[in-house]
Structures are given as C-alpha cells and as structure tokens.
Curated annotation (Swiss-Prot):
<dbReference type="InterPro" id="IPR000242">
    <property type="entry name" value="PTP_cat"/>
</dbReference>
<dbReference type="InterPro" id="IPR003595">
    <property type="entry name" value="Tyr_Pase_cat"/>
</dbReference>
<comment type="subunit">
    <text>Part of a complex, consisting of pseudophosphatases egg-3, egg-4, egg-5 and kinase mbk-2; this complex is required for the oocyte-to-zygote transition. Interacts (via tyrosine-protein phosphatase domain) with kinase mbk-2 (via N-terminus); the interaction does not affect mbk-2 kinase activity, is enhanced by mbk-2 tyrosine phosphorylation status and requires prior binding of mbk-2 to egg-4 and egg-5. Interacts with egg-4.</text>
</comment>
<feature type="short sequence motif" description="RXXL motif">
    <location>
        <begin position="266"/>
        <end position="269"/>
    </location>
</feature>
<feature type="short sequence motif" description="D-box 2">
    <location>
        <begin position="130"/>
        <end position="133"/>
    </location>
</feature>
<keyword id="KW-0217">Developmental protein</keyword>
<feature type="short sequence motif" description="RXXL motif; required for cortical localization">
    <location>
        <begin position="509"/>
        <end position="512"/>
    </location>
</feature>
<dbReference type="GO" id="GO:0019901">
    <property type="term" value="F:protein kinase binding"/>
</dbReference>
<dbReference type="InterPro" id="IPR052782">
    <property type="entry name" value="Oocyte-zygote_transition_reg"/>
</dbReference>
<keyword id="KW-0677">Repeat</keyword>
<dbReference type="GO" id="GO:0001556">
    <property type="term" value="P:oocyte maturation"/>
</dbReference>
<dbReference type="Pfam" id="PF00102">
    <property type="entry name" value="Y_phosphatase"/>
</dbReference>
<feature type="short sequence motif" description="RXXL motif; required for cortical localization">
    <location>
        <begin position="525"/>
        <end position="528"/>
    </location>
</feature>
<dbReference type="GO" id="GO:0030703">
    <property type="term" value="P:eggshell formation"/>
</dbReference>
<dbReference type="GO" id="GO:0040038">
    <property type="term" value="P:polar body extrusion after meiotic divisions"/>
</dbReference>
<dbReference type="GO" id="GO:0005938">
    <property type="term" value="C:cell cortex"/>
</dbReference>
<dbReference type="InterPro" id="IPR029021">
    <property type="entry name" value="Prot-tyrosine_phosphatase-like"/>
</dbReference>
Amino acid sequence: MRTSDSHLPLSNLARSDSIEFKDAVINEKWVHSANRRKGHLTPKAPEKKSGWFGGQKSEEELLMERVEQHELEELQTFIAQKLFRVDGIICDEETRILLVEKLMNAKEYPTINHDELAHRYGSSMAGWLRDRLVPSMSDCSSVLQRAAAEFYQNKMSDPLCNWGQLNPEHVSMVAARIAKFSEEMSSKVKWSLLVEPGKFSCHLTEFVQEFNRLDRMFVSNELSDEESLQTAFNANYLTKARSKMVPCAEFSRVKLNDGLGRLDDRNELRNGMFSDEHEFLQEEGYTAKSTYGTTDFIHANYVKGGPLLNTFICAQAPLKNTQEDFWRMVFQEKCQFIVMLNSAVDSSTLGPLDSANRNHCPYYWPRAENESLRFGSFHITCMKVDSKADPLFTITKLKVQKVGGNLLDAEFDEELFLEHWQWDWQYLGDVHWPFRVLRKARQLSTPTIVQCIDGCSKSGTLVSIETALMHFIRGSPITKSLILQSCVFVRLQRRLSVSSVLLYLFIYRVILRWIEPYVNKWYHRAALGLRFKSIGFIQKYNAMIQEFSRITPAY
C-alpha cells in the first residue's frame, strides 16, 4: 500500500503497537531488500523523533509500521502457500513412484520426469519443482525472488493498494469510512461470562442476527413485479438448472442471443422422468411431438452497477448438457477471466447413480497443454497450464474458437483468449486469496465469470466482498450495515447469494483483513482481535469455522 504523508489523515489511523512476524528466511531485512529491487508499495516510515530520553514514536511512524507489517504478512503467506504447494506435488509424485515400484516387478522403475510434470502442471511449475529439490531453504533465494515478483504484480494499479495517492479529500473520505466501519463492527462484538462459564469471552450473536435479516429480506420486503419475474427459469429448470430451489431472476439473467442452442424433446424428457405405468401421461396431449425449454437460457446472472468497477457474472457449474451453453456465454460476453470455486470430475468415470447426481461438475475445459475439446460450434484449446502463478488456483490459458456457418469447415471465424482459474474452495480461514482474484478482475473491461456448483453461495460471497471493498473506495457514504447492504445488492441480482452464516462472517473477516492497519483505537483493535490473539472477533471466528466446517488448511 503506497501512502502519502500529505494525503493521509494519519492522526485518525494510528495505534500504539506492532506485531513482529518471525521467520528464519522471509524477514523484514529480506523483504525490504526485495522491495528495493521490485519497487515497494509503501513509503519509508519517517525518522523517529527522539528527545533526551529516547522520545516516542509518532502516529505516522506507527501507521507506517502497521502498513509495512501488513504487507509483509501478505507476502509471507503467499510464498509459504506457494512453497507448500510445490512440496505437496513433489510428495505426491514420489509417493506415486514408490507405489509403482512396490507393484511392479521390473528392473527399471519410473522416475520423476520433467516433461511429464510440464504436461500435467505446466512448464512454469515444472521449473519450480526442479528448483525446489534443494537441501535447504537457504538455497532457494531465486525461488523466493520469483515469488515476490509475482506477489507485487498488478498491485501498483490496484485502487485498494494505491488509494493513499488520491487527492486529500478522497483519502479523508476513505479513512472516515474505514473508521466508521471499524467502530460499527467492534460494537457488534459482545462480551459475556456465560458463553464459556468462568471465562470472559466474546460472542458473535449480532452478526448471526444480521445474517438472519438478510435471509428474511425478500420475505419481509416484497419485490416489484419486474424483480420477481423468472419466466425463462420456469421454462427451462428441468433440464438446465441444478435445482428448482435456486431461481434465476429474469431482469438480470444472461440471455444467449446467438440462436445456437438446442431444444429437448418433451416426450423424451417425460419418459426419462416417469415410467410407462403412468397411464395419465399417455393421453394425446402429452404424446404429440413438442419441445421443452428455450435456446436463450443459461443459469447465470449479471451483477453490476452500484459501487462496482466492473461487471460480474455469477453462474452455476455447467451440467453435461449445458457445457455448450456455457461457452456460448463466454464467447458472447468476450470474457477474459473465469473463476471456478468448485472441483470437477471426469464424466466418463461416473456410474449410473453418480451421473444422476447433479452435484457433479464435468471438466468442461481442456486441462493439459495443447489439448482440445469441442462443444457444438466452439473449439477450446489449452494454450498453457500455469500452476505456479497462484499458490491455490490452477490457471489454464485457453483459446476459444467459433466455427463458421458450415460446422464441417475447419476454419474459424473468431478467436477469444482467456484465463481459467480453478480451486475447490472449502476452508474459510484463508482471507488472502480474494484480494488476488479480485485484483485481476479489476484490471479487465469485460465481465468476469465467477462459478461454483450453484452459482450463488461461493460465487455470491466473492462478489459481495468486492462490492463491500468498492464501497470504501468509490461508494456512497456508509450509513450502517455495510456488509448487509452489499449482500442485498448482490442477492437482488443473483438469488440466494451468500447462503450460510459462515460465508457471511467470512466477508466480515476479509474486510477486516484489509482495514487492519488503519484501525487505531485501542478498544476497537481489542474487540476485533487485532491486539490480542486469544480474544475478539478473529479468535471467535476461527473457533467457529473449525467447529462447524471441520476443515483445516493444508498449509
């Protein structure tokens, strides 16, 4: 974060402590050296003004310490996750080879082949795997330098990182919004001796009640006729929706206007749903040749307007029969960035019972370099696999080509290049990754597709985080319940977004991560868990996700 002494109202943002993040390799000396080579996003702290008895640190110095400490922790986490991923791949490959050795009775056993690793994980990750096979961390300086360079990529142009360079009036406005939000959030943290008898601890009841308000919002407040309309969904949900309980609003849905879709035969659909013994379905009106659905429907909605800098599309994971529709949408909207937050399976490996389960997402994109797939009029080619640019996501660079009027013609009319980021997000304790994903989305002028199984829970959470963050930078003056307002804004356009209280709390936790250096008051820092690790919002949140999700991070 780059700041300016003449711009920031530092007296409103300072505090009186700094936490030392200890690491044998990636310490302050190392990161400052790296920053001089790559360019630092924060200015050097002012020199300490000392008097006869050593003096006292100024508010400006304390703020600079917190900002630099915040960025250092981000960098350390990024590199630690990246190195853990490399070690995990190496461990998996060595385990695979060991198992093959035990099962095979041969003179020569397989080894870790660089070309095979490049095919599976991309050439960049294969280089990381090679460089990581060294005896100690002290030999990994080049690896760490490459990771630091990737961490700082695109940060200089990110409004979340450079808002301190704006005009003083705008900076004061952002600082006031941060102060107001931290005050409101800390006031919702309540304390009690009864939650854990004999121990003074906090509870998050008010946050849970706020989520319940969100859940009842559209029940208590009737939508207009235009907002409640879902005509296309009602005409297509049997074949193109994973659940009829997750509607698709008509006014914000993505309409496919190329006319390339196909319609299902109503009789075939009926026979697949009911047995022949249902005689009431054999009447003349039901046996006539007819079709079901429309060609312009896909279960996806735009989320745009308000404080957002760019447009998002929240979409459900493609079904086996809607993969072509998905690529129709990608090509129509000229999307350059797809964020996939769920796992996928190979449809050919599923049995009859598994195939009937609509909770599976097929591999709708080619995963190996130079591999291609064809869906109707669209030819998708994997240009490159990059498993090292981000420590969590597998990045596939794709080329989408549309066949001309003659479907047998090998020539393509148009081409589209995009990046597909895939990660099965389950653990709610990592609050760093949304900033990396959203930073890339802000750089693009075309819509960003955010996709999970239902297109609402995880997808809506990520877009709600962006909505809340942009409220600080360019939104209207914050009154109350910023997170609630942001989620209502997203839910109005994409129904049932942010489907659980844990996802709702995750939004608060991510926003808290961003404002952390700028929270100045002692009580606010204590209530939010920024001053003491054993009490406050952060401690209670971590306990809740461990209790309810039962998932721990791999790193």
